[in-house]
Amino acid sequence: MKTPRRRMRLAVFKALFQHEFRRDEDLEQILEEILDETYDKKAKEDARRYIRGIKENLPMIDNLISRYLEKWSLNRLSAVDRNVLRLATYELLFEKDIPIEVTIDEAIEIAKRYGTENSGKFVNGILDRIAKEHAPKEKFEL
């Protein structure tokens, strides 16, 4: 059974992923198509907050991820890896109540489920470095 927060993260990931192929459509509208009556009120609110936060901070998030890609550009990554990294980087930097380990573990699970056999390990390496150098100090105490 998926926890409400895990389902929420999956909804955000799916919206980000679909937006890659539906660029002319609004990201928030894509999310609304994914959120149905099986999501509780808090999960919907959290998903909407994540999407708004990712949209508002996307250039900074992408720039930060790009700094840790060795011999790769963000555009060369698979859509799965790119959007898992965006989701998790947002959560690491802006969602103060979520422990770093939880964010990274959840991102690895999504990457393994939807990506290639190497996606989990790849995402783990990038996020670990981002967390160590950029996560707010109080997150290390959670």
From Swiss-Prot:
<protein>
    <recommendedName>
        <fullName>Transcription antitermination protein NusB</fullName>
    </recommendedName>
</protein>
<keyword id="KW-0694">RNA-binding</keyword>
<dbReference type="GO" id="GO:0031564">
    <property type="term" value="P:transcription antitermination"/>
</dbReference>
<dbReference type="GO" id="GO:0006353">
    <property type="term" value="P:DNA-templated transcription termination"/>
</dbReference>
<comment type="function">
    <text>Involved in transcription antitermination. Required for transcription of ribosomal RNA (rRNA) genes. Binds specifically to the boxA antiterminator sequence of the ribosomal RNA (rrn) operons.</text>
</comment>
<dbReference type="InterPro" id="IPR006027">
    <property type="entry name" value="NusB_RsmB_TIM44"/>
</dbReference>
<comment type="similarity">
    <text>Belongs to the NusB family.</text>
</comment>
<keyword id="KW-0804">Transcription</keyword>
<dbReference type="GO" id="GO:0003723">
    <property type="term" value="F:RNA binding"/>
</dbReference>
<dbReference type="GO" id="GO:0005829">
    <property type="term" value="C:cytosol"/>
</dbReference>
<dbReference type="Pfam" id="PF01029">
    <property type="entry name" value="NusB"/>
</dbReference>
<dbReference type="InterPro" id="IPR035926">
    <property type="entry name" value="NusB-like_sf"/>
</dbReference>
<keyword id="KW-0889">Transcription antitermination</keyword>
<keyword id="KW-0805">Transcription regulation</keyword>
<dbReference type="InterPro" id="IPR011605">
    <property type="entry name" value="NusB_fam"/>
</dbReference>
